[in-house]
């Protein structure tokens, strides 16, 4: 506990909140170009081949974004829209590609859940 004299000498610093998606620069979504599309394996105890893409955003950042849904048409040089939202079992993947916008087509034969999330 600081004394009053110590508080006068240097005031309390406010706690700065750190953003979970710095590459978006405060925007809800960002456009980017795929530089590489590949699969990675999740951490324990899960097992799969998760589809991800390396994306160069208009903000200048190069990020790894998850491609949700079953089947995709994304390839190198595809222009995609990226939103925030991490994938819990993929370390370092903090963004999602928005399906159904720009070059990323929606999920084929999907009956439900045609929201922005997929």
Swiss-Prot record:
Write out the transmembrane intervals: none
Its localization reads:
Plastid, Chloroplast
GO MF annotation terms: rRNA binding; structural constituent of ribosome
Cite a single GO BP annotation.
Answer: translation
InterPro entries associated with the record: NA-bd_OB-fold, Ribosomal_uS12, Ribosomal_uS12_bac
Please classify the protein's predominant subcellular localization into one broad category. plastid
Note the CDD domains from the entry. Answer: Ribosomal_S12 (cd03368)
* PROSITE patterns for the chain: RIBOSOMAL_S12
Per the record, the domain of life is Eukaryota
Q: Report keywords, A-Z.
A: Chloroplast, Plastid, Ribonucleoprotein, Ribosomal protein, RNA-binding, rRNA-binding
- Cellular component, GO, one term: chloroplast
Cystines in this chain: none
Assembly information from the UniProt record? Part of the 30S ribosomal subunit.
**Family stated for the protein in its record:** Belongs to the universal ribosomal protein uS12 family.
Report the function annotation for this chain: With S4 and S5 plays an important role in translational accuracy. Located at the interface of the 30S and 50S subunits.
Name of the protein in its database record:
Small ribosomal subunit protein uS12cz/uS12cy
Q: Which organism is it from?
A: Liriodendron tulipifera
């Amino acid at each position: 506990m600081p004394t009053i004299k110590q508080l006068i000498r240097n005031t309390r610093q406010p706690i700065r909140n750190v953003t979970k998606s710095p590459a978006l620069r405060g925007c809800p979504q960002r456009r980017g170009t795929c530089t590489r599309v590949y699969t990675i394996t999740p951490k324990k105890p899960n097992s799969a081949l998760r589809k991800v893409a390396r994306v160069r955003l208009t903000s200048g950042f190069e990020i790894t974004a998850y491609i949700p849904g079953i089947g995709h048409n994304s390839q190198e040089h595809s222009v995609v829209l990226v939103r925030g939202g991490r994938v819990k079992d993929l370390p370092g993947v903090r963004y999602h590609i928005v399906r159904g916008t720009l070059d990323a087509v929606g999920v084929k034969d999907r009956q439900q859940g045609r929201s922005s999330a997929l």
